[in-house]
């Protein structure tokens, strides 16, 4: 197997597609435009590495003479996976990711998880956040933290020890947890415990 960088893989795919659709390979300038490289010397460098790896053959005397060789299998770089805890219940007085709170673990690509941060997932029940694109039975991806800025969507523990997902606003003498549904009223609290900030949504199609 030949391991390629994303840029090299993009170049190789573009060359193959151009040969397939047009019958001849692209120029160096066209390759650069397709993959976002302004410098022709940078494109030449990538082509040289592809040639060294045995994936293409070039004729230096001709501007478009690039032949793709298919003898080797190209290995597409794979994302690392992070197993994120899915919280089944939120219990007051114990950490959100305590073992007794966790239903299962869900694998997410590492690019969806901020480096060095603690992240958990929570299933949404109800329609209080539909105008924010968060629907019943969705799973929110939450970065664990105990503070938030006004307007951020948070997981908060109310005075009744119930977890809720709402938009956070700190007013003069109280906290307003604002739903994103015009048919629902905000929750007004004197004290609230923030468990985390919502950074993503995962949805399955039924």
UniProtKB/Swiss-Prot annotation:
GO terms for molecular function: DNA binding; serine-type endopeptidase activity. Keywords: Autocatalytic cleavage, DNA damage, DNA repair, DNA replication, DNA-binding, Hydrolase, Repressor, SOS response, Transcription, Transcription regulation. One of its GO terms (biological process) is negative regulation of DNA-templated transcription. Residues 28-48 bind DNA. It holds the Pfam family LexA_DNA_bind. It is an enzyme of class 3 (hydrolase). Transmembrane segments: none annotated. The record marks 92-93 as: Cleavage. Its EC number is 3.4.21.88. It catalyses: Hydrolysis of Ala-|-Gly bond in repressor LexA. The active site is at 128 (for autocatalytic cleavage activity), 166 (for autocatalytic cleavage activity). This is LexA repressor. It comes from Bacillus velezensis (strain DSM 23117 / BGSC 10A6 / LMG 26770 / FZB42).
């Amino acid at each position: 197997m030949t391991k390629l960088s994303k840029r090299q893989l993009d170049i190789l795919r573009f060359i193959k597609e151009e040969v397939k659709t047009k019958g001849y390979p692209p120029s160096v300038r066209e390759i650069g435009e397709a993959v976002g490289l302004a410098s022709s010397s940078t494109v030449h460098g990538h082509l040289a590495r592809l040639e060294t790896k045995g994936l293409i053959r070039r004729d230096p005397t001709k501007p478009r003479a690039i032949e793709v060789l298919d003898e080797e299998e190209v290995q597409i770089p794979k994302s690392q996976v992070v197993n994120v805890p899915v919280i089944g219940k939120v219990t007051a007085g114990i950490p959100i990711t305590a073992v007794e709170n966790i239903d299962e673990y869900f694998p997410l690509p590492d690019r969806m998880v901020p480096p060095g941060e603690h992240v958990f997932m929570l299933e949404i029940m109800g329609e209080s956040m539909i105008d924010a694109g968060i629907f019943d039975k969705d799973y929110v991806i939450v970065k664990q933290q105990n503070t938030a800025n006004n307007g951020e969507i948070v997981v908060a523990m109310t005075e009744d020890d119930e977890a809720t997902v709402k938009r956070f606003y700190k007013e003069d003498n109280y906290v307003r947890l604002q739903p994103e549904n015009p048919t629902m009223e905000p929750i007004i609290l004197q004290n609230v415990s923030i468990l985390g900030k919502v950074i993503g949504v995962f949805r399955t199609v039924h």
